[in-house]
């Protein structure tokens, strides 16, 4: 808390964006409403649907910082760019597609502020929060990948593939992201779980998943890549 009794603005929110012209401004506005947010780092990853032009023409709050990739390089590359520019003590990942509610950050940041966690995952599968009905095979695939994660790394996560990951900045400074694509999700999890010094918490979150018709980008191929990534970092020195 600051001298006025309000939560301090300590959170940097990193938003990787690719072809989200319909939702990106709404998501940025939702994030900026949070009193804990110090900055919003937006990385347009070579969008071709007009997203970049919308971002460039919009007069944003001074807390918003924009970065642009000239071509589509992938979510991992976008996060690498974003993480390299954050200034907040705590960093969170936010997709631009409205599947996740930024209000959840108020709960997720508490274990970090209380000094009991270094990393907090927002779990869509631990129960207790509203959920839009999932695509069945996505649910099965995520459940399988989470089981493999728990087995390989001796942890008890319930939602390895969640977008909502929050870190003390020092944690990110200790991780070198190698993946350019969606494999960044299992890579981050693998490297976090391998480092037994980092305390990981899970917090239940709400989730309003999109259909493919609404713009969902994850397919079964990403699941195979995620499995390979988990196995690779289990044995990699």
Predicted segments, located by residue:
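Hydrophobic helical membrane-anchoring modules
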Residues: 1-9, 152-154, 177-237
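Conserved sequence signature across two-component system core domains
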Residues: 17, 43-45, 69
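Short, well-formed alpha-helical segments that are part of the catalytic scaffolds
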Residues: 20-33
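Donor nucleotide-sugar binding loop of glycosyltransferases
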Residues: 20-23, 47, 75, 101
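Conserved donor nucleotide-binding strand/loop of the catalytic core
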Residues: 38-41, 52-85
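A conserved acidic beta->alpha catalytic loop
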Residues: 44-53, 98
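Acceptor/aglycone-binding surface of glycosyltransferases and processive sugar-polymer synthases
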Residues: 69-85, 90, 102-182, 208-227
